[in-house]
Amino acid sequence: MIEATDFREGMSLLPTAVNVITTKGNSGCHGFTASAVCSVTDTPPTLLVCMNQTSRSHAHFLENKTLSVNVLGTQHESISNAFASKLCSEERFEHGAWTTLATGAPILEDALVSFDCEIEDIQQVGTHSIFMCRVVAIKQSESDESLVYFNRSYHQVGQTEIV
């Protein structure tokens, strides 16, 4: 049997994009930092988002049934940290400039790309909920430098200039 700590150690060596997942609706405005996000299909455009069921905002995502995936750029490390912290929801959204698209879920104005989604299906697997999310709107920036998490620290991926 594989121990959870061994699995987490191995997964720390898998480079992942850093995302802030947000929701807004009858249950309020909430968000969290996530790396467990991936494309499922482009027809219809669908993303998979994983969320720990013990997260204090978990019930709010279930009730609102919408979310946005905000892919962070290198300038967003402080936003990632805020949404991964114990700050209350209102304090988290004091970091960054926010707007909305079709669903009303908060969109980070200068994210690399934001996917505005409706949650179509939810599966429970172990400690996490897996949200299957239909993308209904996309906002893309001009930036091309991504914030990546690898080996328990942030890294930069993208355009570099050699002088």
Language model features by range: what are they?
Residues 1-163:
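Basic, polyanion-binding surface patches
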